[in-house]
Structure formats: structure tokens, C-alpha cells
């Protein structure tokens, strides 16, 4: 019987035995196998990690003779979940205890190195965050001081001139002076930083020259150089931090300046709106004044017309009174006298019309006589004119 047949029969026997076990024993067996699988998984990951390191170190695909973990080991790691009899058989083909100990020690050293790197990174991050917090506290103190100075120097002096152009100009001048001072400080720090870098380069050059000449440096000299280098690095870092703070302050100042510019533009627009409203109000006032004068003239005219109407009314009353008086004194004639006067008036009108016709007839006769006279006169003149040359 071959090995495969024996393994198959052993697995079938174990499966039959496991099927005969009760449920709680099966649960315990499952837990035990799960624990073993987790341990094997951890061990496999460790082996794979070590194998990957070897591959990176060799930079070439390893041969089967150079691999410490043989194919039998891989088969053994994959088949650990099989029967106990087969597990016992494969343990003989696995790694030795010394090999496993060596792998575990290397993994432990790598883990310690990673922990040291993580601790160093964490300390560096902690120092960075502490520096940021310290910088923020310093910046907050400076901002409070600047706000106090601004309120003391500017706000209290321009509170009574709110909205005026002089107040805006004063604020702009204050901000420009502050920016100028910060720029000067930034230039000074930059020059100091450049000088420190130049000094550091000189020291490095001297150190390189000494190494080239072959002078032996003692540990004390190296320690002194390290201390000086650390001091210079701290100074450079401090100058860089001050430069960063100045840049932040300059950026904040520019933001404040832009805010005041926007506020000034808003105030200027409000002033323009108020001026337009004032112009509109003045125009309306002029229109109202003109209308008031027109109404006043109209009122004076109405008063004059009222006085004239009063005078006319007085005259009309006087005339009415006079007419009433005449009417009261009027006496109508008797009827016969009135009829007689009426007949007489009619006769007189007839006589007048008759004489008017006679006058018209006489005028027509006169016109005829004048025409005949003129004709005779003309004829006589013609005759005289004709007879004159004959004499």
C-alpha cells in the first residue's frame, strides 16, 4: 500500500471517528483547531516576512537548495489542519528548533527596531506639535498685545471720527507702519540666518580641510563640534521659527489690512449713498421752497382777488341799495296816459321813418344832380380846351 492510500484511509478513519463524537467534543475540537490555525497563520506570516527579506537581500530568485523552508515545510504548514497522525508525520519534516529560534530572534530584533523607529517618530512628532503649540501661544500673546495697542492707539482716537476719511487714513498708516517694522525685522532675521549658514559652511570646510590634511581629531573635538553644531542648528531653527512667525504675522496683518480696506470701501459707499440722499433731499428742499413761493404768490393773488371781490360786492350792494331806493320811489303813470304816450310814440316813429325815406330820396336826387353837374362841368372844360387854341 502506498503513502497516499495510507493517508486516505487514515483521514477516512479519523472522519468517521469525528462523526461519532458528540457535539460538545466537536466544539472543543473546532476551538482547538482554530487556535492552532491562528498560531500557524502567525508563524507563516513570520516565515513569509523573513523570506521576503532574503529575496530583497539577494536581489535574485533563490534556488531550492538555498531555501531553508523546504517544499515539505510548505506542505506541512498547509496540511496542519488535517489529522493528528498526519500532523505528527509532518512535524518531522519541519524546521528545527534552532532555526525557529533564529527566525524568532531576528523577528524580535526587527520588531524592536520598528518600535524604536516608531518611538523616535512619535517623539519627533510630539516635539513638532509642542513647538506648534508654543508658537501658537506666542502668536496669541502677540495678537492680544497688537489688539491692545491698536485699541489704545487707534480705536480710542478715531471713535469720535467714525466713518470719516481721516480715521481710515490713520488706520491705513498704522497698518503700513506695522508691516514696515515686520519687514525690517524679517530682513534682519534673514541676514542673521544667512550669516549663520555661512559660518556653518566655513566650519564644515575647515573640518573637511583638517580631514584632508590628516590631522587626527579626538573625541573631545568631535563632541565640541557636535555641541557647536547643535547650538547652531538650534539657533537656525529659532531664527526660522521667528521668520515663520513674522510671515504669519505679516499674513495676518495683510488680512487685517484687507478687512479694513473692505470696511473703508463699505464706509465710502455708504458716504456716497448718504451724499446722494443728501443731494436728493436738498433738491427736494429746493423744489419745496419753489413750490412754497408759488403757493405764497398764489395766496397773495387770491387775497387780492378776495379784496377786489369784497370791493365789487360793496359796490354791488350800494348799487342794489340805490336801485331798491329808486324802485321804492318809482311811480307808474296812469293807463290812459301810457296808452296816449304809446300812440304818440308810434306816430313819431312813423314820422321819423317817413322823413328818413325823404332824406334818402333827396340824397339820391342830390347824387344825380352832382353827377349831371360834374358831367356838364367836364364837357364845359373840354369845350374851353378845344376853343382855346382856335382863338
From Swiss-Prot:
> One Pfam match, by short name?
CCDC113_CCDC96_CC
Residue ranges annotated as transmembrane are none
| Major subcellular site | cytoplasm
Q: Tell where it localizes.
A: Cytoplasm, Cytoskeleton, Microtubule organizing center, Centrosome, Centriolar satellite; Cell projection, Cilium
This entry carries the following GO cellular component terms, namely: axoneme; centriolar satellite; ciliary basal body; protein-containing complex
Write out the coiled-coil annotation as residue ranges.
95-243, 294-369
Which terms are listed as keywords in the entry? Cell projection, Cilium biogenesis/degradation, Coiled coil, Cytoplasm, Cytoskeleton
- Subunit details for this protein? Forms a complex with CFAP184; the interaction is required for functional activity in cilia. Interacts with HAP1 and PCM1.
Q: What does this protein do?
A: Component of centriolar satellites contributing to primary cilium formation. In complex with CFAP263, acts as a regulator of ciliary beating that connects radial spoke 3 (RS3) to the inner dynein arm (IDA) and the nexin-dynein regulatory complex (N-DRC). The complex is positioned parallel to N-DRC and forms a connection between the arch at the base of RS3, the IDA tail and N-DRC.
Family according to the record: Belongs to the CFAP263 family.
> What is this protein's name?
Cilia- and flagella-associated protein 263
- What organism is listed for this UniProt entry? Bos taurus (Bovine)
Amino acid at each position: 500500500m502506498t503513502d497516499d492510500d495510507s493517508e486516505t484511509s487514515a483521514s477516512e478513519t479519523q472522519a468517521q471517528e469525528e462523526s461519532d463524537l458528540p457535539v460538545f467534543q466537536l466544539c472543543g475540537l473546532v476551538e482547538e483547531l482554530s487556535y492552532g490555525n491562528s498560531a500557524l497563520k502567525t508563524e507563516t506570516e513570520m516565515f513569509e516576512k523573513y523570506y521576503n527579506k532574503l529575496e530583497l537581500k539577494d536581489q535574485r530568485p533563490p534556488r531550492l537548495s538555498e531555501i531553508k523552508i523546504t517544499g515539505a515545510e510548505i506542505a506541512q504548514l498547509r496540511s496542519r489542519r488535517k489529522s493528528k497522525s498526519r500532523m505528527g508525520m509532518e512535524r518531522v519534516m519541519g524546521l528545527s528548533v534552532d532555526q525557529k529560534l533564529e527566525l524568532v530572534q531576528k523577528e524580535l530584533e526587527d520588531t524592536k527596531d520598528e518600535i524604536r523607529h516608531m518611538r523616535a517618530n512619535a517623539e519627533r512628532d510630539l516635539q513638532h506639535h509642542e513647538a506648534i503649540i508654543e508658537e501658537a501661544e506666542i502668536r496669541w500673546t502677540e495678537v492680544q498685545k497688537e489688539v491692545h495697542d491698536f485699541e489704545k492707539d487707534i480705536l480710542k482716537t478715531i471713535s469720535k471720527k467714525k466713518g470719516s476719511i481721516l480715521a481710515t487714513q490713520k488706520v491705513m498708516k498704522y497698518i503700513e507702519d506695522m508691516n514696515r517694522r515686520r519687514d525690517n525685522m524679517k530682513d534682519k532675521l534673514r541676514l542673521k540666518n544667512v550669516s549663520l549658514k555661512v559660518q556653518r559652511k566655513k566650519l564644515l570646510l575647515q573640518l573637511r580641510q583638517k580631514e584632508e590634511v590628516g590631522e587626527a581629531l579626538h573625541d573631545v573635538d568631535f563632541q565640541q563640534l557636535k555641541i557647536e553644531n547643535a547650538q547652531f542648528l538650534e539657533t537656525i531653527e529659532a531664527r526660522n521659527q521667528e521668520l515663520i512667525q513674522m510671515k504669519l504675522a505679516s499674513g495676518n496683518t495683510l488680512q487685517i489690512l484687507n478687512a479694513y480696506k473692505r470696511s473703508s470701501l463699505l464706509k465710502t459707499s455708504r458716504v456716497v449713498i448718504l451724499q446722494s440722499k443728501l443731494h436728493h433731499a436738498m433738491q427736494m428742499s429746493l423744489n419745496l421752497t419753489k413750490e412754497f413761493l408759488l403757493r405764497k404768490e398764489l395766496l397773495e393773488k387770491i387775497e387780492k382777488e378776495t379784496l377786489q371781490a369784497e370791493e365789487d360786492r360793496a359796490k354791488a350792494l350800494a348799487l342794489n341799495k340805490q336801485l331798491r331806493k329808486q324802485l321804492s320811489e318809482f311811480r307808474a303813470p296812469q293807463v290812459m296816459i301810457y296808452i296816449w304816450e304809446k300812440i304818440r310814440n308810434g306816430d313819431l316813429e312813423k314820422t321819423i321813418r317817413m322823413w328818413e325815406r325823404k332824406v334818402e330820396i333827396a340824397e339820391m336826387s342830390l347824387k344825380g344832380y352832382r353827377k349831371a353837374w360834374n358831367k356838364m362841368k367836364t364837357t364845359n372844360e373840354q369845350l374851353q380846351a378845344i376853343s382855346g387854341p382856335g382863338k
